[in-house]
Curated annotation (Swiss-Prot):
Organism from which the protein derives: Hebeloma cylindrosporum
Binding-site residues for L-lysine, renumbered to this chain: 123, 457
Activity regulation, short description: LAAO4 is activated by exposure to acidic pH, the detergent sodium dodecyl sulfate, or freezing.
Activity sensitivity to pH: Optimum pH is 6.0 to 8.0.
Pfam families: Amino_oxidase
Sugar-bearing residue positions: 54, 164, 193, 331
Ligand binding (L-glutamine): 123, 457
Protein's UniProt name: L-amino-acid oxidase 4
Alphabetical keyword list: FAD, Flavoprotein, Glycoprotein, Oxidoreductase, Secreted, Signal
Signal peptide positions (record): 1-18
Amino acid sequence: KSFFRSLVAASLVIVSYSADTTSVPFDAESRDQIFQHHARSVISGYTNTLGEKNISVPSSPPGGERVGILGAGIGGLYSALILQSLDVPFEIIEASNRVGGRLFTHKFPNGGKYDYYDVGAMRYPLPKSDDKGNYQPGVMQRVGQLFTYLGMHKQLIPYYFKSNKSPGFQYFNGVRARIGEGSSFDAPALGINSSLIDIGVTKIVNDAVGPFAQALFDDLQKHTTTGWDDMMKNDAYSTRSYFSFKYLPSPSFGLPSEHFSTRVINWLETFDKSTGWYDRGLTETVLEAIAFGEVGDGEVDWRCIDGGSHVLPDTIAAFLHKKGGNAFVMNASVTAIGLENPNKEDSPMVVVAGGQKRKYSHVISTLPLPVLRTVDLKNSKLDIVQSNALRKLQYGPSIKIGILFKEPWWTTGQDKNGEKFDLVGGQSYTDLPIRTVVYPSYGVNTNAPSNTLIASYCWTNDAERMGSLIGTGKKTYEEQLEHLVLSNLAAVHNTDYQYLKDRLVDVHSWDWNHNPLTMGAFAFFGPGDFQDLYTSLNRPAANGKLHFAGEALSVRHAWVVGALDSAWRAVYNYLYVTDPAKLPKFFELWGKNAEWFEQPGDGKEPNSDNSLLEKFVRRTHGTVSV
């Protein structure tokens, strides 16, 4: 998966167990509309429970006072871009010595131009665009528009989700095959009957999640909520429990009409996702299936950034510096956020960072939620539901191990049988500890091909186990990790361990779960989280002056676009209660997120008459004179 699933990472991992890959067959715009419908229904259902009574908003401090932005990741930087365009003063507080957060590229010292790997976000499944960077509607449209706004669309290069030459490998149960060759991988030894093997993992999984996706799409066409209602009836299920207690195979498969055994579910999970994925929410799996469909379907333009994903936050930071001077406070960890006087409704906000108190009119926090929970919030007046959400909302672990070799052996080398690897981009998959191998897409067709390989990309339980060997500071464990990874690579590629060892130059490994500034890789919702936790943290705290943002607070979480969407919503909340006269320019420059408007129907554009966001703010935050 891409990190943040572009970020922000689990990304879309499509493993073809049988000869054909599957997808939920919607075009890019329809997929985006389904996400909008899902988010709109969650928020609308919650908002409607609040009743019509509005509460007056405390008067805000006089205009001109700074907004504090916590975190210089992509969500914080995007918030700053929006505020700057509206002439709203701001200051960004960042705990580290760099911007970008989980957009992080490691460049190997003394390596060549393309000897780097993206530790965080690494790939961007954008909608189609013209030569000027005008993007068609789609799930990632806002990301594409950001590249264009910054003049970066020419820096995007093809990302090969599938190898540009020969297919990658699958190596499961000690059996190796090129992707698409269609091996059973000795599944009968696991007690998997031949009928299931013949049908294939992808068809079975689509049979389970596809009807939910289709029903959500039908809602859009018929202006109903039937599909949504059915999805919510099953929202309390994990993917595993749904297969165990609810799902029955379609009659067309010719299988017994019975729920799946644990053995079969484990088999599905192994080839479909990562270890433990099916313990997370069913809704999460459905949205994953909808997100981008089949790779290569023509609707998605997979891209990466020439030079690495860090180029994006670095470009934003330079843009902000050029337009408004130095608004960054670096190397300052936030330890407290709250009202200066919790008993006064017009009290300003105070943030303690780097041991110093800093005063703001409002605060937008883009800190990862596990990190935010370690901050002193006693004067922020979070309600019980919000406090529980910070404790409960799940983040998924993720690790990456990048290796610099002397040469790109995965392209130029050959295996023990003399078969050339011939891999350019794409991925290989295995049940060995390294799980996913990602071959570089940058440096292709240049005189400086990348010698760097993402030798292991893991998430969920697989990442937790590999992460135990990362960052220990002990040479013994570093050597153990190196030996494990090289041994796994040799098995997957049918080559000798020593062949790889002789070509190794350097190793860099990263564990997001044990990083004190993230405490996890990306939001990964469990059963029921959408209905409860998601709604509570889209509300502000501290008398409406503490706004939460970040990829976790979007239905598109774990992708860069989720961080952008939530930042857009947080800035809207701030403007609505402080300077609503700026909202027309806000919409003109930064567009609208359709999920925050009632489904207009009849081709009408979202407007103030159908603004779900305004309704949400009024009922959770109060009213102002507009």
